Swiss-Prot record:
Keyword Transmembrane helix: no
Residues modified to N-acetylmethionine: 1
UniProt record, GO biological process: cytoplasmic translation; maturation of SSU-rRNA; ribosomal small subunit assembly; ribosomal small subunit biogenesis
SUPFAM superfamilies linked to this entry: Nucleic acid-binding proteins (SSF50249)
Compartmental location: Cytoplasm, Cytosol; Cytoplasm; Rough endoplasmic reticulum; Nucleus, Nucleolus
PROSITE patterns in the record: RIBOSOMAL_S28E
Organism (species): Danio rerio
Cellular component GO terms held in the UniProt record: cytoplasmic side of rough endoplasmic reticulum membrane; cytosolic small ribosomal subunit; nucleolus; ribosome; small-subunit processome
The protein's name in its UniProt record: Small ribosomal subunit protein eS28
Amino acid sequence: MDASRVQPIKLARVTKVLGRTGSQGQCTQVRVEFMDDSNRSIIRNVKGPVREGDVLTLLESEREARRLR
């Protein structure tokens, strides 16, 4: 793996749980706010139990999930 292309791991706090997604509802769509610059927030899909206030470790911080319909 090329070390120059590796992104740093970012911490993000769950600010709002938006709903369930996936073919069987196995993922939860959440809005997260980055802890290093708190004015930036994105929507991510999370697998497993999650609630507001949880801190997620994001290996890929640029990818954003499509919104629920």
